[in-house]
Amino acid sequence: WAAGDMQCQGFLIGATSGRTTLNGEGLQHQDGHSHLLASTIPNCISYDPTYAYEMAVIVQDGLKRMYEKKEKVFYYITSLNENYPHPAMPEGVEEGIRRGIYRLRESAGTDKPVQLMGSGSILRQVEKAAEWLNEKGIAASVWSVTSFNELRRDGMACEREALLSAGQRTPEPYVTAQLKQSEGPLISATDHMKAYSDQIRPYIPQGRAYQVLGTDGFGRSDTRDALRRFFEVDWQHVAWAAGYELMKEGTLSADELESWREQLSIDASKPDPLYS
């Protein structure tokens, strides 16, 4: 808040992003809410990238905005502290990275489509869930959401323009335009509180289900795998959420979904991590 008040420019890097990334620190350091706090600061541009090319595009854009265009903004970027492969940047995704969302991987199939969205460390869980679902004949595509905050701000700006023009101008939010190019229910999973990704619910294309997974509750000291299982943001819970939404819309039978329970180790009697 002090940086915003002083009109600072620069990059603030949160190097222990997410509730499950810095495992073993428990209540002391696990962060599931900093992006929500960042959203309260008007001149703070925040991102939760996963891959090195996303970070590069964001930093390049920040340098241009702050030091070439002289915009009075500063950046809050969360980074991770675990080792994983970093792919080459797909073609044509720069604008999506800057604005907050792009399709990382489109399913080759078309049967039972579902859209999986993720950010930060949990994007890799989302990618693993998509692979499992594809093996089950589910056309699961993956979206990288670099900034739910920026998507929300864009959506609110579009709503404001429509309001003040009495409907004469009705710009479409960027996230709406992107997701309209897909079909099926949408599942979002992040390493932050559910409220972070739930911000864009008003801008989900009409008639589409939107299921949000997040890390509400106090941090714990454990392995990353155990923490993600505890907060229900591991790949198994992402896959289960996709199956549940497909069942609700009638494209997956209840019996077929129930057959997944043992395979994914989904416990219906598990205590809610928000209170446990």
Predicted regions mapped to residue ranges:
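Long, structured ligand/cofactor-binding scaffold of large enzymes
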Residues: 1-4
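Extended active-site and interfacial segments that coordinate phosphate-rich ligands
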Residues: 36
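Thiamine diphosphate
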Residues: 10, 16, 20-31, 39, ...
